[in-house]
Amino acid sequence: MIRSLNDVDYPILERYMRNYHNMVNTYKNKPSDMNELQYMNLESIVKGITQVYNDSEVKVQQIIKLTWWKDKKYTDEVIADVMGISELTLRHVKEVILKRVAKAVDYV
């Protein structure tokens, strides 16, 4: 049974999103001090986020980039303005993205 996400889960999933590119590099160059379970967990996260991104519409991909992957940190207000949506809609889209990531990485 899949449990619903709570206030503790979202920051963890957001950290996965922010650290995605670093995790990809670690995954590609498996450190010798990483055990198999850690590596399998990392693989699940990397492949799950990649799948969510690739399966998303271009507008959603842009939200992912602006929210979590750009070096410059944009506020929700700026991202919503750039995307032509309300901040409420942006927050909803981000929540949906994180739920998709949670499912794709077997978080829940």
Regions of interest found by a model, annotated:
Residues 67-68:
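Short helix-to-turn junction characteristic of helix-turn-helix DNA-binding domains
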